[in-house]
């Protein structure tokens, strides 16, 4: 297994002026502080990262007014060999990643504070793929996701070989690979903005993927050529890793899966 030091970046910010419904319901300032199974969302993510091999540092991208609530959570996971610090979240995902990576050469592991089902096996899988790539993103098949929970995910990317859901964990080999994050510069979901997809991946590639006439490996080769760096996919057999706490529905799903996992660990 590939094992090398890696900096973990946890995106925990939220849009300025927008009150997250889950945070409002829980009476907290930020979604990352919403409790699930008795602990804040981000606490579950930090636990997974702190339990993983060779995480050299954890950087949390978050607004200043959330830091006081994070102090005891950080204290529970920080060690002499694992510093955890906060850096101000920027206005978008890309700028937040760039700010969190400032002054560091990489490699980087990027995830989100609502990725509560993250585990060490997922981190190891991404690390393994990143040893052979500039950038890595993670996927689980629709069968794996629906097997984990029938209501866990409703959006899948259809390829000729299978349909996949995205998992919110990414690997970037070095600072040069941060240009991969520029794909998301405009923010939002690709599915809602075809023009954004075309600019990022090229029209011919989008058409091949849109109509499911190309396999995922073939698509990765074509997109790698388009972007001029090696892009690889980490395949997760655990479909639960494609389920984040996005809304009331997925909160309930994650709560059920977390409780089941914690019971099994006893």
Predicted regions: what is each one?
Residues 24-43:
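Short catalytic helix/loop segments, enriched in acidic residues and glycine
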Residues 1-27:
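N-terminal nucleotide-binding beta1-loop-alpha1 segment
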Residues 65-71:
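Short, charged/polar "capping" segments at the starts of alpha-helices
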Residues 118-224, 236-240:
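Conserved core of the sugar-phosphate nucleotidyltransferase
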Residues 57-63:
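Short internal beta-strands
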């Amino acid at each position: 297994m590939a094992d090398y030091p890696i900096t973990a970046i946890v995106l925990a910010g939220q849009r300025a002026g927008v009150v997250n419904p889950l945070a409002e319901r829980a009476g907290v300032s930020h979604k990352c502080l919403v409790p699930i199974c008795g602990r804040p969302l981000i606490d579950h993510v930090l636990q997974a990262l702190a339990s993983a091999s060779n995480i050299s540092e954890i950087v949390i991208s978050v607004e200043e007014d959330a830091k006081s609530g994070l102090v005891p959570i950080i204290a529970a996971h920080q060690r002499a060999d694992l510093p955890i610090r906060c850096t101000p979240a920027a206005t978008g995902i890309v700028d937040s990643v760039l700010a969190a990576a400032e002054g560091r050469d990489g490699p980087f592991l990027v995830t989100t504070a609502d990725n509560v089902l993250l585990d060490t096996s997922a981190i190891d899988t991404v690390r393994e793929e990143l040893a052979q790539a500039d950038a890595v993103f993670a996927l689980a098949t629709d069968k794996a996701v629906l097997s984990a929970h029938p209501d866990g995910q409703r959006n899948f990317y259809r390829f000729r070989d299978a349909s996949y859901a995205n998992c919110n964990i990414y690997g970037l080999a070095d600072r040069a690979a941060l240009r991969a994050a520029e794909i998301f510069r405009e923010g939002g979901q690709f599915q809602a903005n075809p023009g954004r997809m075309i600019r990022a991946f090229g029209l011919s590639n989008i058409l091949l993927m849109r109509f499911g006439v190309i396999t995922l490996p073939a698509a990765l080769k074509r997109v790698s050529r388009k972007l001029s760096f090696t892009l690889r996919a980490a395949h997760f057999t655990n479909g639960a890793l494609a389920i984040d706490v996005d809304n009331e529905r997925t909160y309930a799903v994650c709560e059920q899966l977390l409780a089941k996992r914690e019971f099994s660990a006893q």
